[in-house]
Amino acid sequence: MSIYSIVTAPDERLKQKSKPVLECTDQTRKFMHDMLETMYNANGAGLAAVQVGVLQRILVIDIKAHDPVERPKDFYPLFIVNPEIIEQSTELVTANEGCISLPEQRIEVMRPESVKIRYLDYHGKSQELKANDWLARVIQHEYDHLEGKLMVDYLSNLKRDVVLRKLKKLKNNIV
């Protein structure tokens, strides 16, 4: 297993739209496992491939410890390839979010309370998943990464600029 470096804002790769995966191969599955290890290492709930510098439509999610919904034992981790949001609720919920690509930042984001996605699973089989509450939020957050959107994009221009300046300063102090 490999642990990748996390791409952090204001890196321009995070603003690019990811490309579909053409086929789920053994190499794709190994990459997903490496993404999962990287996510665990960073104490994340989800990770999009772009966050490790790969512009492919792949997400990994594991919120087992925080999911209020009782799920089958083998439900997590979720390996999600080429997701599409096919339904979303009209009810919006605001909650505080963090992101491993935006270190030390917490932002209130309003999102649909539930979503339904269509995607390819670990084996490349088409699946649909209806999610609400915390899982829906994590899916939408990670999906945004595939679209080149960050949680700061939900802020006003002024607030977004303040956060991005903080991140740039933080990044310069680390390097």
Swiss-Prot record:
GO biological process: translation
Catalytic activity: N-terminal N-formyl-L-methionyl-[peptide] + H2O = N-terminal L-methionyl-[peptide] + formate
UniProt KW Amino-acid biosynthesis keyword: no
Superkingdom field: Bacteria
Free-text cofactor note: Binds 1 Fe(2+) ion.
Molecular function in Gene Ontology: metal ion binding; peptide deformylase activity
EC numbers on record: 3.5.1.88
Active-site residues from the entry: E142
InterPro entries membership: Peptide_deformylase, Peptide_deformylase_sf
Co-factor requirement: Fe(2+)
Pfam name, any one: Pep_deformylase
Residues bound to Fe cation: C99, H141, H145
Gene3D superfamilies linked: Peptide deformylase
Alphabetized UniProt keyword annotations: Hydrolase, Iron, Metal-binding, Protein biosynthesis
Family stated for the protein in its record: Belongs to the polypeptide deformylase family.
Function noted in UniProt: Removes the formyl group from the N-terminal Met of newly synthesized proteins. Requires at least a dipeptide for an efficient rate of reaction. N-terminal L-methionine is a prerequisite for activity but the enzyme has broad specificity at other positions.
Protein name: Peptide deformylase
